[in-house]
A protein has these predicted regions:
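Two-component system phosphorelay core
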Residues: 3-147
Length: 147
């Protein structure tokens, strides 16, 4: 045992790889290495058909804005089932057109609403507006032919 102690074995056994207080700290937003918008995602979905891509991207920008307004209303009214339903809907739409960071954040909100974690919903819901705005800017630049 003396040889193990000399090599630091006992120190290793008593160390933790993280501070346990970090486990209880809430997350303000889902850390996301995902891109705000992946322009190849829409092509993987519908192929190289530019007209179809344009139509789906245009529809996403309009319907996502409406869905986001619904999420904001559900959040303001503390309506967890509606928040979950709308977050699920926006998640699917966002991922299909390549708004990956928005889709991931919607997934986190949907999961929090499903778990009835109101505190987490309170932190996540307001972050969607900024992610949608960033995604919309990139998508609209593509639609206008500048990206």
């Amino acid at each position: 045992m003396g040889r193990l102690r000399d090599t630091g074995y006992l120190l290793f056994l008593t160390m933790t790889p993280f501070d346990t207080f970090d486990l209880n700290r809430p997350v303000d937003a889902v850390p996301s290495p995902l891109p705000v918008w992946d322009p190849q995602a829409i092509e993987r979905l519908v192929g190289a058909n530019q007209a179809m891509q344009h139509r789906l991207l245009t529809r996403f920008v309009v319907t996502a804005a409406d869905t986001l307004a619904g999420i904001e209303a559900a959040h303001a009214g503390a309506d967890l089932p509606e928040l979950m339903r709308l977050a699920h809907s926006l998640k699917s739409a966002a991922r299909s057109v390549g708004a990956m960071a928005l889709g991931e954040q919607c997934f986190a909100l949907e999961s929090a609403a499903r778990a009835a974690d109101w505190a987490q919903c309170q932190r996540l819901a307001p972050t969607l507006t900024d992610l949608f705005s960033k995604s919309r800017s990139l998508i609209e630049a593509r639609l206008q032919g500048t990206a």
